[in-house]
């Protein structure tokens, strides 16, 4: 999780936003909630797939056949685990953005207007058609597009209309 850099004076001391943070008020977003069925914790601002155990579950994307159902939302009141990590552990309720805007950190450089892709080998981290076409290892997130041109590892904006 990104932390504000307070080593300089003046200017913008905080990041644009944090991965998975909504850019607008909650009432302007359409979200669903599903239970993380996998032992792998789910991060904020990544694509997740429909679970296999029931209609009310989701999981980390591990294969191209795991079709994305939305992007994980960061809740500001999430407690850290014993290791200091803040994410959605197994059996946690995971808020999933279906319609709205959020901040996200791309795994690769992305261009404004490019389709959001889930990078399979990175467990659902986000890329775009700027880095390569959808195909093996690069699954399109339905209705999701980058609103900003963003360098890999920096904060950008995503719009999703599911």
Language-model features, listed with the residues they occupy:
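Surface-exposed, low-hydrophobicity beta-strand/loop segments enriched in small/polar/acidic residues
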Residues: 1-162
């Amino acid at each position: 999780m990104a932390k504000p850099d307070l080593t300089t004076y003046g200017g913008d001391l905080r990041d644009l936003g944090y991965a998975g943070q909504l850019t607008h008020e909650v009432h302007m977003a359409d979200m669903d909630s599903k239970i993380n069925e996998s032992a792998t914790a789910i991060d904020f601002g990544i694509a997740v797939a429909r679970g296999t155990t029931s209609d009310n579950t989701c999981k980390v994307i591990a294969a191209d056949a795991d079709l994305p159902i939305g992007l994980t939302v960061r809740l500001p009141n999430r407690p850290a685990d014993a290791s200091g990590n803040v994410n959605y552990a197994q059996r946690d309720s995971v808020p999933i953005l279906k319609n709205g805007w959020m901040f996200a950190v791309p795994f690769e450089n992305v261009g404004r207007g490019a389709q959001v892709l889930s990078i399979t080998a990175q467990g659902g981290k986000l890329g775009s058609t700027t880095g390569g076409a959808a195909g093996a290892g690069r699954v399109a997130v339905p209705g999701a597009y980058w609103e900003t041109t963003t360098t890999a590892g920096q904060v950008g904006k995503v719009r999703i209309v599911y």
